[in-house]
């Protein structure tokens, strides 16, 4: 049990203009505007309150990482990050009539990956969690290296080594059916 004491909430809004522009698959733009507005407040809070760790929990969106790693004397944990996966072949029929959105999203993903590498934003993280292997490979693969530890975590909270492989699961199901 961890008693919650002295919790403070700070509300930071963004202008409605950005809310109207950044909708749907462009939502990460809204988060990036918000991150820029929050950074000065986060710096002040960390200095005044002696904060040790900032953990940015995004809506599983690698395109919307704040630059909290620039704040002095704190550890910046980011993730779980997702959004780097491509539309699976088995679901391409569902995208009929909306293919342009997937093409634009793919282009935006590549641009943000390039931007993250150039700015070094990922390397200012002290720890990164990835929500899926595709995003991990998309951001770390291709010769990119991270200067911080990272791991793959799933949205169900299980680590890959905690998952039962399919054949083991089938065996358990068969045993249960026999009883």
Describe each model-derived feature in a short phrase.
Residues 1, 64, 168-179:
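Short, intrinsically disordered, charge-balanced linker/junction segments flanking boundaries
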Residues 8-11, 78, 108-173:
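Donor nucleotide-sugar binding/catalytic pocket of nucleotide-sugar-dependent glycosyltransferases
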Residues 31-39, 53-93:
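An aromatic- and histidine-rich active-site surface loop
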């Amino acid at each position: 049990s961890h008693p919650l004491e002295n919790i403070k909430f700070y509300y930071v809004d963004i202008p409605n203009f950005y809310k109207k522009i950044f909708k749907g698959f462009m939502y990460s733009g809204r988060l990036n505007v918000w991150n820029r507005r929050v950074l000065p407040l986060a710096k002040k809070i960390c200095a005044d309150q002696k904060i040790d760790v900032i953990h940015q929990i995004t809506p599983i969106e690698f395109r919307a990482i704040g630059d909290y790693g620039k704040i002095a004397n704190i550890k910046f944990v980011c993730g779980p990050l997702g959004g780097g996966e491509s539309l699976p072949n088995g679901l391409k029929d569902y995208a009929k009539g909306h293919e342009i959105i997937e093409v634009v999203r793919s282009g935006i993903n590549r641009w943000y990956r390039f931007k993250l590498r150039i700015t070094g934003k990922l390397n200012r993280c002290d720890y990164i969690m990835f929500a899926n292997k595709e995003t991990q490979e998309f951001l770390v693969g291709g010769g990119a290296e991270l200067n911080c530890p990272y791991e793959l975590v799933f949205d169900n909270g299980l680590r890959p080594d905690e998952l039962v492989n399919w054949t083991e699961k089938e065996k358990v199901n068969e045993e249960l059916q026999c009883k």
